[in-house]
């Protein structure tokens, strides 16, 4: 994860990327700057290019000595997360598990992102959506709704591999049609069997697969979809005021996951074309994936973690669309209190009714 500082040329204040305006803004003097002014700086930092992956990827740029100037890499000894901050930051906490982090090295040689989707929703929107997520949860432990805790929600650019692939497939199916009719006194069921064949190709573009071991795959998949048409070429200025997770899953490691998603989608698409039968069963499947390429991208996610009774609960919101995900626990002790309280009220009501009946009879 990276937390970078840019100084305002007007007042020397710390600049931040404003999600609503889509510009870099100074919160002290309200000066606004278009992203174009940072292009020349990034072009100079990107002057050294190096091939880094043997697998077919669109990503070739790496962090260089000039990129690393004034930056340090920290590691979380608890969950293994690696983050990048400016060297003036003496200490920080992990956004995934809230544990302390320690200095470990720099980014030189690491692959640099190709694309980034800037945050569209700010911290205020994330807090509002989290509060809405808690609404009506009467058995929720109080730590989850503590206002000071809600203020700890963090904007994190999560690393993703964006895959493009072509699937060439041929499928064979056993199909049946079933008809019932009456002949005299007999009810006849006629089942006819058919063979169906399908072949063709499908193009897949912009399949996102997260490149971080610290966040659960099911959580990141639940945050989808991201509108990748809004992705722009990576510039470090977009990270001002936010963090960016350092990827620890390579494109090769993620290939198995994306291949499974492509194959599942291909099988479903082909099966949808076999219509008009009572039953359809696949008997042979041959799917070949070709021309697979991957781009390295950073996608915006608001993250908050809460530890309760030894378990870590992570809540996340898509920083582009506002989609919110995360499981909430039930406070069993509070549940028992409510149950006993309800039972006590019922007992008192029953006693009162009985007493009144006895009194007036």
Residue ranges: model-predicted function:
Residues 8-11, 26-29, 76-79, 94-97:
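Short cysteine-rich clusters marking metal-coordination/redox-active sites
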Residues 351-361:
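Juxtamembrane boundary at the C-terminal end of a transmembrane helix
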Residues 163, 295-345:
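Extended hydrophobic
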Residues 30-37, 98-105:
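Short Cys/His-rich micro-motifs in 6-15 aa windows
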Residues 109-307, 311, 359-360:
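Charged, low-complexity helical/coil segments in non-catalytic cytosolic or luminal regions
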Residues 3-5, 21-23, 69-73, 91:
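Residues immediately within or flanking Cys/His clusters that coordinate Zn2+
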Residues 21-25, 38-44, 88-93, 106-112:
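Short cysteine/histidine-rich zinc-coordinating motifs and their immediately flanking basic loops
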Residues 13-16, 34, 84, 102:
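Short functional micro-motifs and their immediate structural scaffolds
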């Amino acid at each position: 994860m990276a937390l970078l500082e840019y100084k305002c040329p007007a007042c020397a204040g710390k600049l931040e990327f404003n999600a609503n305006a889509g510009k870099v803004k100074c919160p002290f003097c309200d000066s606004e700057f278009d992203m174009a002014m940072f292009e020349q700086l990034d072009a100079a930092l990107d002057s050294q290019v190096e091939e880094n992956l043997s697998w077919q990827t669109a990503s070739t740029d790496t962090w260089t000595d000039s990129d690393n100037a004034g930056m340090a890499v920290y590691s979380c000894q608890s969950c293994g997360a690696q983050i990048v901050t400016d060297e003036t930051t003496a200490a920080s906490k992990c956004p995934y598990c809230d544990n302390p982090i320690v200095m470990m090295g720099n980014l030189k040689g690491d692959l640099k992102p190709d694309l980034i989707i800037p945050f569209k929703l700010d911290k205020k929107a994330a807090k509002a959506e989290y509060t809405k997520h808690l609404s009506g949860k009467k058995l929720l432990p109080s730590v989850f709704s503590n206002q000071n805790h809600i203020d700890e929600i963090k904007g994190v650019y999560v690393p993703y591999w964006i895959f493009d692939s072509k699937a060439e497939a041929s499928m064979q199916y056993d199909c049946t049609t079933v008809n019932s009719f009456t002949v005299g006194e007999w009810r006849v069921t006629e089942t006819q069997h058919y063979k169906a064949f399908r072949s063709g190709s499908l193009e897949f573009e912009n399949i996102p697969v997260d490149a971080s071991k610290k966040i659960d795959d099911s959580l990141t998949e639940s945050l989808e979809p991201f509108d990748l048409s809004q992705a722009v070429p990576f510039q470090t200025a977009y990270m001002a005021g936010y963090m960016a997770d350092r990827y620890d899953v390579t494109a090769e490691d993620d290939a198995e996951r994306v291949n499974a998603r492509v194959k599942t989608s291909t099988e479903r698409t082909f099966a949808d074309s076999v219509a008009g039968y009572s039953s359809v069963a696949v008997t042979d499947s041959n799917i070949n994936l070709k021309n697979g390429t991957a781009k390295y991208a950073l996608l915006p996610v608001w993250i908050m973690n809460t530890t309760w009774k030894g378990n870590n609960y992570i809540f996340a919101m898509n920083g582009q669309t506002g989609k919110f995900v995360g499981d909430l626990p039930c406070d069993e002790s509070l549940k028992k209190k409510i149950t006993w309280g309800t039972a006590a009220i019922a007992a008192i009501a029953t006693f009162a009714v009985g007493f009144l009946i006895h009194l007036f009879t």
